[in-house]
Amino acid sequence: AMIQAVKDGQFDVGMDGITITDERKQQVDFSDPYMVSQQFMLVRADESRFASAADFKADEKLLIGSQAGTTNFYTAVYSVLDGDKQNPRIKLFETFGAAVQALLAGDVDTVLMDASSAKGYIGANPDKLKMLDEALGTEEFGYIFTPGSDLTAPFNAAIKTMQDDGFLNHLNTRWFFLYDANAK
C-alpha cells in the first residue's frame, strides 16, 4: 500500500523497512541503501522441533506466518519451502504484528523477519520469543520517492554523509540492535 501511495504521489517519501528490488524500482525511485539486513526465523522461546530452515521444511505440520508480497514472504517461499507461492504452509496476515501474535498464540510456528525487527519483538516478549541463528537472506532498505522526485539526490547525499562519518552505523546500532523495549 505504501509503495502504491508514493508512486501515485499521495506522499513525497516513504520509509518503513522497504527492500530495494528491481521490480519495485519500476514503480518508485529508491534512495541509496541506509541499512543492510538479514532474514531470520522468529520462533517461540520453547521451540525445539526445528533449529534450521531445512528442519522446518522437512516437517510438513509446521506453518509460517507472513505478510503477502513482502521480502519475508518471498524468503519463506524460496529459501524455506518449495517455491510455491500458494503453499498452504504459509498463513498470510495483514501485518507482521498480527503474524507475531499468531506465533505467540501457537497458530503458526515461525515468522520470518529481519534481525532488527526480530530483536524488537523479542525485547517486548523476552521470555516468549527467540531468533534462530541461521541467516536466510540479505536485503537492503531504502527510502522510496515518487518517480522523478527531486528529493532523491538530497537524501542520497545525507545518507552518504552519515555513512562516511559513522553516524548512520551509530543510529542503526542504537535503535535497532541495542534498543530495549522494556527500558524505563
What are these model-derived regions, one by one?
Residues 6-7, 56, 103-104, 143, ...:
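Hydrophobic residues within well-ordered alpha-helices
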Residues 59-69, 93:
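Short beta-strand->loop
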Residues 71-90, 130-131, 160-184:
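Ligand-binding clefts/hinges and TM-proximal coupling segments of bilobed small-molecule sensing domains
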Residues 1-17, 26:
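Extracytoplasmic small-molecule ligand-binding "clamshell" domains
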Residues 36-46, 115-160, 178-184:
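Periplasmic-binding protein-like
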Residues 16-27, 75-79, 104-137:
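A ligand-binding cleft/hinge motif common to bilobed small-molecule-binding domains
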Residues 44-63:
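Flexible hinge/capping segments at coil-to-helix
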